[in-house]
């Protein structure tokens, strides 16, 4: 909200300038201890309403309406302590910045699974963008510490409302069973990160949206997994490859997994890595 700048109303509390000739409040070459602490917390939840059905046990259809919520809080404190005596007994400064973000949104997901045969299925799903309405508040304060007194100046609270539209996602999947003992499944996920957009009635996000479109791209993510069933013991393995969301970047991320499961007399034990 502040473009990483300090509200001009806070400047007098720094005591770093004078309306006449410059007078330093700190000795030249004095030692200073600079520290910065950032504490943050947040969460995201989603309430969903789903509906599903089948046609002749061959085609399975499903749809979901999601209502996600998010919240985020951050407190940043920058402190500068003067470790030596100063001209005016100045001991230090601190800058406190507080950011609070809350939002709610809506999205739709739909999909279908087709059973080609008893042992082979294919499926597809489409996840719409999530349309978030977000509210943010930002405040800052400057504290100046002298040996004889302290001074504090608090900036006016800044409030901002905007819309965030997240990328859409499509998933294609297939699974097959071989000889009743081997299960093989694969997913192809397509995500267009360049679709992300910001909108606001009080601010023109044209340049930010252009930067998003120029910096991000559509990416393909691939996952494959297998399970071998030895009656009471099951062996599992998986592999994933995620493409880079950034343009002009060939980076990709790979993942591997192994697992074993035990099922005996209604007791289950699963170990995975």
Kindly label every feature range from the protein language model:
Residues 1-273:
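Outer-membrane beta-barrel porins/channels
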């Amino acid at each position: 909200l502040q473009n990483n700048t300090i509200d001009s109303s806070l400047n007098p509390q720094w005591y770093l300038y004078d309306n006449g000739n410059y007078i330093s409040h700190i000795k030249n070459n004095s030692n200073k201890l600079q520290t910065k602490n950032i504490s943050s917390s947040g969460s995201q939840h989603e309430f969903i309403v789903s509906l599903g059905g089948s046609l002749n046990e061959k085609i399975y259809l499903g749809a979901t309406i999601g209502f996600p919520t998010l919240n985020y809080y951050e407190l940043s404190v920058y402190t500068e302590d003067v470790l030596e005596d100063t001209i005016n007994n100045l001991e230090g400064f601190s800058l406190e910045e507080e950011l609070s973000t809350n939002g709610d949104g809506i999205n739709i997901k739909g999909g279908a699974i087709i059973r080609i045969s008893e042992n082979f299925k294919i499926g597809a799903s489409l996840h719409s963008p999530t349309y978030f309405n977000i509210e943010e508040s930002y405040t800052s304060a400057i504290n100046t510490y002298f040996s004889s007194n302290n001074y504090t100046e608090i900036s006016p609270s800044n409030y901002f409302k905007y819309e965030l539209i997240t990328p859409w996602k499509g998933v294609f999947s297939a699974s097959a069973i071989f000889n009743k003992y081997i299960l093989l499944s694969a997913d192809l996920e397509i995500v267009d990160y360049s679709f992300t957009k910001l909108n606001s009635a009080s601010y023109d996000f044209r340049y930010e949206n252009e930067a998003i479109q120029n910096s991000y791209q559509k990416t393909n993510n691939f996952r494959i997994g297998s399970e071998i069933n030895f009656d009471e013991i099951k062996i599992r393995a998986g592999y994933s490859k995620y493409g880079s969301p950034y343009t002009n970047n060939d980076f990709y991320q790979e993942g591997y997994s192994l697992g074993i499961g035990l099922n005996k007399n209604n007791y289950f034990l699963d170990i995975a890595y």
